[in-house]
């Protein structure tokens, strides 16, 4: 293409219209200009002899892969403008504003001309022909209006726009013809007036239909949004309420379990004094000739109380067994009530039968809850390269641990009795000191942790109850050898030994705010003790004199020490 001439360049400079370039037009690389001065400068100018080297990794701007959900879609300008036309809040352009102003001016001019024509004419000069033509035009417009109502929203818009344009064209044509010819007939003026009124009414009706259609569509969208939001809120509230109900049920179950455990522990604590008293009872041997004094009434009352307690415990165990069994046919029948005449062997047999039936269920429940409560421990290698988590003690069930604990306790007590007793047989005593102490320790620790009351009670707790250092933390069994924690570096003065004392709390030095002096206090107490002030002062003078004499003697003795060998 030939370069531009000077005249063309001057015309471009004098043209005040700014050049508009579409930024979304990807096919165009830039503004079409053949001017050499507007061309971009070559960045490699003067560097042709350099070796071509790519950008460094830090200077290279690699695109960030955000994923498919962040990828946009390309649309045309027409689709974008079509979407923006539907927006009632979009900004209006200058062309649209000018068109609306022109239409308003034309409508005002037509209305003024029609008013002048109508005032000049009289009703007598209007012929019958204008009336018939007006009626025909009204009838045609009503038919077109009915047909436009049956169509959808888009049809309404197009028909209304065509009718308004047609009416405007007709009015403009009529106005021009009247100006050119200069002849204004009364019939044409009347018809033009009626046509203008009908066109305005139709325009208003079409505008009202559009507004109503837009309002109904917006209201439907809002109702749909409200319905979706309400359904989402109901779903979220239902899930939250279900989770809260489940947590509340778990909390109530745990609270009930703790209350049951506390009640059983309270009963065991109350039985401790009775068990201690029973173990102190003397046991008479079969070959002894001693006949202790027997109180028949006390024995009968104790026997009846023991049988009542035994009956209550048996009823409780039978109720628990029936609750565990769902089948009615497998439920145990209630035996006859015990009495004083019932033999001890029958009582023992009934107890062993109940125990044998309850043992499997008890062991199953204990193992299940022990596995749930026991946390998962990581397998860590020890000094020998073995895994600590793979030990046999961690794989044992709680029922096996309890059996081993009971067996060890029974064996230890039997060995102690054999060492301390004579040739006589073992005394039938009930001894669960270790278990009872563990229960007490758990109870005290729970109370101490729940209430931040007294910290000094922990020290008294360790003094009163035996420590748990000799019990294995997993199996619960006592260790044979307890390794003492001894600091090997503390010998030979390599480590300073000290005791850390607690800080003094709420300490405040005494402050004397009294009005009495020390002399007044001494006189007051001297009068209470029957001494006079003069005697008290005389005693003070004697003490001062003796102290002065002693100080003089000390000085002389110190001076003589210099000459001692």
From Swiss-Prot:
Residues 1-31, 125-154, 207-225 have a biased composition (Basic and acidic residues). The keyword Nucleus applies. InterPro entries: AATF, AATF/Bfr2, AATF_C. Keywords: Nucleus. Residues 1-225, 404-430, 537-565 are annotated as: Disordered. GO terms for cellular component: nucleolus. It is found in: Nucleus, Nucleolus. Its main location: nucleus. The keyword Nucleus applies. One of its GO terms (biological process) is maturation of SSU-rRNA from tricistronic rRNA transcript (SSU-rRNA, 5.8S rRNA, LSU-rRNA). Residues 95-124, 155-206, 540-556 have a biased composition (Acidic residues). It comes from the Eukaryota. Belongs to the AATF family. This is Protein bfr2.
């Amino acid at each position: 293409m030939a370069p531009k001439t000077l005249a063309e360049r001057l015309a471009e400079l004098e043209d005040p219209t700014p050049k508009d370039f579409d930024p979304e037009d990807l096919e165009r690389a830039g503004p079409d200009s053949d001017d050499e001065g507007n061309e971009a400068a070559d960045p490699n100018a003067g560097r042709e002899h350099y070796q071509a080297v790519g950008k460094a990794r830090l200077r290279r701007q690699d695109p960030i892969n955000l994923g498919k959900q962040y990828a946009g879609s390309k649309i045309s300008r027409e689709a974008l403008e079509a979407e923006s036309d539907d927006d009632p809040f979009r900004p209006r352009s200058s062309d649209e504003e000018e068109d609306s102003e022109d239409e308003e001016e034309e409508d005002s001019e037509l209305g003024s001309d029609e008013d002048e024509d109508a005032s000049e004419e009289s009703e007598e000069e209007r012929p019958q022909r204008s009336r018939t033509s007006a009626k025909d035009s009204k009838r045609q417009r009503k038919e077109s209006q009915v047909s436009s109502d049956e169509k959808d929203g888009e049809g309404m818009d197009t028909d209304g726009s065509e009718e308004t344009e047609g009416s405007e064209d007709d009015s403009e044509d009529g106005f021009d013809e009247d100006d050119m010819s200069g002849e204004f007939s009364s019939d044409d003026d009347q018809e033009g007036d009626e046509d203008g009124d009908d066109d305005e009414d139709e325009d208003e009706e079409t505008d009202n239909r559009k507004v109503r259609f837009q309002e109904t569509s917006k209201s439907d969208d809002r109702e749909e949004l409200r319905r979706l939001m309400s359904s989402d809120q109901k779903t979220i509230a239902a899930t939250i309420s279900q989770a809260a109900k489940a947590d509340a049920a778990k909390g109530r179950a745990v609270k009930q379990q703790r209350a049951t455990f506390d009640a059983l522990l309270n009963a065991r604590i109350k039985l401790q004094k009775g068990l201690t008293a029973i173990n102190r009872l003397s046991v008479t041997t079969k070959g002894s000739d001693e006949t202790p004094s027997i109180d028949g009434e006390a024995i009968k009352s104790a026997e009846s109380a023991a049988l009542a307690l035994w009956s209550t415990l048996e009823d409780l165990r039978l109720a628990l067994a029936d609750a565990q069994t769902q089948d009615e046919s497998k439920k145990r029948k209630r035996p006859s009530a015990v009495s004083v005449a019932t033999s001890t062997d029958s009582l023992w047999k009934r107890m062993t039968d109940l125990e044998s039936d309850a043992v499997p269920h008890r062991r199953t429940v204990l193992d299940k809850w022990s596995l749930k409560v026991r946390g998962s421990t990581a397998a860590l290698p020890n000094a020998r390269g073995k895994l600590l988590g793979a030990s046999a003690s961690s794989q044992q069930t709680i029922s096996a641990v309890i059996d081993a604990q009971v067996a060890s306790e029974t064996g230890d007590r039997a060995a102690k009795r054999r060492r301390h007793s004579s040739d006589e047989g073992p005394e039938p005593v009930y001894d669960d000191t270790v278990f009872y102490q563990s229960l007490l320790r758990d109870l005290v620790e729970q109370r101490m942790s729940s209430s931040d009351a007294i910290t000094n009670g922990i020290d008294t707790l360790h003094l009163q109850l035996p420590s748990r250092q000799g019990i294995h933390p997993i199996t619960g069994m006592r260790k044979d050898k307890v390794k003492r924690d001894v600091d090997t570096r503390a010998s030979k003065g390599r480590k300073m030994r000290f005791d850390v004392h607690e800080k003094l709390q709420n300490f405040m030095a005494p402050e004397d705010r009294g009005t009495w002096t020390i002399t007044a206090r001494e006189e007051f107490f001297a009068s209470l003790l029957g001494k006079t002030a003069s005697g008290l002062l005389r005693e003070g003078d004697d003490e001062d004199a003796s102290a002065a004499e002693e100080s003089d003697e000390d000085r002389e003795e110190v001076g003589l020490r210099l000459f001692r060998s």
